[in-house]
Amino acid sequence: MYSIYEAPFMKEMCEMTQNLWRNGWAEKNGGNISQLLEASEIKHYLDTDRYLWTEPLGFDASPLAGNVFLVSGSGKYFKNVQKNPADNLCIIKVSSDGASYHLLWGLENGGRPTSELASHLKCHIVRLSQDPDHRVILHTHATAVSAMTFVHDLDEAKFTRTLWQMITECLVVFPDGVAVVPWMVAGTNELGEASAAKMNDSRIVVWAHHGIMGAGTTMDDAFGLVETVEKAAKIYMQIAHFPTGIKQAITDEELVALAERFNVVPKAGILKEAGGVK
């Protein structure tokens, strides 16, 4: 076996947690990440049939039976991941019946996987049903989009349209729009179920007054989605409350033209023309 610290997926996780912390989106122990690992990725680094311990999940994860995930730990600080991955991360395997998980590696000084494990696994189930190339769920406390949930209507169509109007690239990056979940108690199966339901048709779920969850085929993909939403929200928060108001923005007609140029289909019900007829 090779050193797991040299595994590309481990190096990428360490880099990503540093990026999130440096952006100010992972204060204290805030934020969590999970990545589905392919057998070909992990076979040279870890014996996936050797378990350190097993714990019940408390929900049915049978669609993920036998799958292995690299997951951030509960109560762990993203800023510490790079200097001590084995204490702050873990690798888990969903049991054959989907009722529990096995710890394969990590959490060397004790602990459990992220308290949002239910949200992560439920969202993985949904996204894999929509996209077999899906791999990553990322949750972080992005500042501007969290602030936006206090002052903007939480209607998903209105929220998405505002973001699309802030930066030209937004419609191209997330034509499937942004889903919004109202404030719910963190770390619960209920929040996981609500988030997963939203991920049937959107890769981005905003948790009102809390943060954002993004799904992607790679770490860069998931991070890029969150990064783009956050930048659009930051622009909105900087301009929306000027006494003059917003004097001009990208129009629906211009967004339709943009979608046609980049061959994307805007989520229905948001724009007044073409792919998003109201």
Swiss-Prot record:
A GO CC term assigned to this protein in UniProt: cytosol
Keyword field contains rRNA processing: no
Active site, renumbered: E116
EC number(s) recorded for this UniProt protein: 4.1.2.19
Catalyzed reactions: L-rhamnulose 1-phosphate = (S)-lactaldehyde + dihydroxyacetone phosphate
Cofactor binding: number and manner: Binds 1 zinc ion per subunit.
Single biological process term from Gene Ontology: pentose catabolic process
Cofactor(s), by name: Zn(2+)
Similarity field: Belongs to the aldolase class II family. RhaD subfamily.
Name used for this protein in its record: Rhamnulose-1-phosphate aldolase
Provenance organism: Listeria welshimeri serovar 6b (strain ATCC 35897 / DSM 20650 / CCUG 15529 / CIP 8149 / NCTC 11857 / SLCC 5334 / V8)
